[in-house]
Regions:
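Juxtamembrane cytosolic amphipathic helices that cap and anchor the N-termini
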Residues: 1-12, 91
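Conserved extracellular-gate-facing transmembrane-helix segments in secondary transporters
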Residues: 14-23, 106
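Short amphipathic helix-loop junctions that connect adjacent transmembrane helices
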Residues: 24-41
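Helix-to-loop junctions at the C-terminal end of transmembrane segments
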Residues: 55-67, 151-152
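Structural signature of the two symmetry-related core transmembrane helices
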Residues: 70-85, 164
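Intracellular juxtamembrane helix-capping segments at the cytosolic ends
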Residues: 108-121
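A late C-terminal transmembrane helix in Major Facilitator Superfamily
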Residues: 123-153
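A membrane-interface helix-boundary motif in multi-pass transporters
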Residues: 149-167
Length: 180
């Protein structure tokens, strides 16, 4: 189980890093690259946040039926589709509609990620919860470390491709974790 816990730490850290790259850069991408209004960035965050809670509840409902690993895989695929679609979207309406994928991604990560750690470490629930919480911090560190360098050298587009790559790493690691 220690190996599974370590792999899940990588999975969740990569998922949070991808999300944090998006959160750091999305407003600038919307304004500087797509030349859309700054109001849109706030609307996108608001819609995603409003949809995350129902997604967490839906994920909790399906958790016993399809398992945590499959739900996390659904989250990763949703995230990959979301970041790829954000790169291609050019209108405010499409950017807003895509937030459903973002909400699926984050709703499952927030709702199921911690439970997965706790199930892998049933004798250490507090440690499992802390470990999960630390994946968010590690994600911020990773995203913040590469963000400025990548934008300066390449572009905002490169960050979305990096986010997709991080989710690819998460997906590969997830496939080696026992489903509980």
């Amino acid at each position: 189980r220690k190996r599974d816990t370590r792999l899940l730490f990588v999975v969740c850290s990569m998922m949070w890093a991808a999300n944090n790259l998006y959160m750091i850069n999305m407003p600038l991408f919307i304004i500087d690259e797509l030349h859309l209004t700054d109001k849109l960035a706030g609307e996108m965050i608001g819609i995603a946040a409003g949809l995350e809670i129902p997604m967490m509840l839906i994920a909790g409902y399906y958790m016993k039926r399809i398992g945590k690993r499959l739900l996390m895989l659904i989250a990763i695929v949703s995230g990959m589709c979301f970041y790829a679609s954000v790169l291609m979207a050019t209108t405010p309406a499409i950017e807003l509609e895509l937030q459903i994928l973002n909400a699926i991604f984050l709703g499952i990560l927030c709702g199921i990620g911690m439970l997965y750690f706790q199930d892998l470490m049933p004798e250490k629930i507090g440690s499992a919860t802390t470990l999960y919480a630390n994946t968010s911090r590690v994600g911020w560190i990773i995203a913040g470390s590469v963000d400025g360098i990548m934008v300066e050298i390449w572009s905002y587009h490169a960050l979305f491709w990096l986010a997709i790559g991080m989710l690819g790493i998460a997906m590969i690691c997830l496939l080696f974790i026992k489903d509980i």
